[in-house]
Amino acid sequence: MKIVIDLMGADHGVLPIIEGVSRALENKSFGAVLVGDKDKATPFISKELASKVEMIHTQDYIKMEEAATEAIKRKESSIYLGMDILKNGADALISAGHSGATMGLATLRLGRIKGVERPAICTLMPSVGKRPSVLLDAGANTDCKPEYLIDFALMGYEYAKSVLGYDSPKVGLLSNGEEDIKGNMLVKETHKMLKAYDFFYGNVEGSDIFKGLVDVVVCDGFMGNVVLKTTEGVASAIGSIFKDEIKSCLKSKIGALMLKNAFDTLRQKTDYAEYGGAPLLGVNKSVIISHGKSNARAIECAIYQAISTVKSQVCLRITKAFESLKPSASTHQSDQQDA
């Protein structure tokens, strides 16, 4: 299995990415192709690691403040070269760089799965249950039609079932109330259409995401990204409050030591790094979009996630799902093209 890792554009430079790759190679067998500035990367690559990875040199990359469309023009940028390697034989790609550039190039270079109108970012959310919930779209499509959300539901269902191993996953539609009559026009129309699918649970509220009421939560990319960023902010704030209170007195420090295992579990469930990255579902190969602030652990977990998506053949499973479950899938044409 060959995995392409974009070294460029992340908030903390190349070091956390290289460390993440190194750790993953200690635990899993895969071919790693690193794409980025060799001069910046070489000081952090040991002789042992150098023997295990392939390095593709380029100094160009799409900066966060640049438009995503720049990626189409910049054929020597790290994400363009990486996507080209993926298209021509690699199995998966991971990038913590410009997410818009990654999404745009994935759609143009890899093409959409037949029947998929819009690819979606799929992310895992912490839950009080033993397994996380799946949320999509987490930011790829801010303006949506009901048909897009149907696609998201089908893709999320297949991801939960094939990659995460959830048995008969239930899909909920994010709304401002659980009643069928609640929601804006988009939610109401989508609700009517989702009733045709056995996996549909009904409307769910924001709080239900973390209760494990359903396995997959579907919404437009604007709402999904707000939910995601709010969750990250709340988790960070709670962590800071705990740290301040623990440091406040000796009794708190002693209590914290006694509850160390519980705190470790809480941290693991709420730390984005443990979830790796967010798969871009709906394109013809496995693409994982990692957080710009990713540390070594996040990159390591993103690689494990990529391996799981490839082994589970999620792209093929989504293709078959659209052929069998989506009535209108046969009327759509694949967006595969040579850019």
Swiss-Prot record:
Its EC number is 2.3.1.274. Keywords: Cytoplasm, Lipid biosynthesis, Lipid metabolism, Phospholipid biosynthesis, Phospholipid metabolism, Transferase. One of its GO terms (molecular function) is phosphate:acyl-[acyl carrier protein] acyltransferase activity. Its main location: cytoplasm. Pfam families: FA_synthesis. It is an enzyme of class 2 (transferase). GO terms for biological process: fatty acid biosynthetic process; phospholipid biosynthetic process. It is found in: Cytoplasm. One of its GO terms (cellular component) is cytoplasm. InterPro entries: FA_synthesis, Phospholipid_synth_PlsX-like. It catalyses: a fatty acyl-[ACP] + phosphate = an acyl phosphate + holo-[ACP]. Pathway: Lipid metabolism; phospholipid metabolism. The keyword Lipid metabolism applies. It comes from the Bacteria. Homodimer. Probably interacts with PlsY. Catalyzes the reversible formation of acyl-phosphate (acyl-PO(4)) from acyl-[acyl-carrier-protein] (acyl-ACP). This enzyme utilizes acyl-ACP as fatty acyl donor, but not acyl-CoA. Belongs to the PlsX family. This is Phosphate acyltransferase. It comes from Helicobacter acinonychis (strain Sheeba).
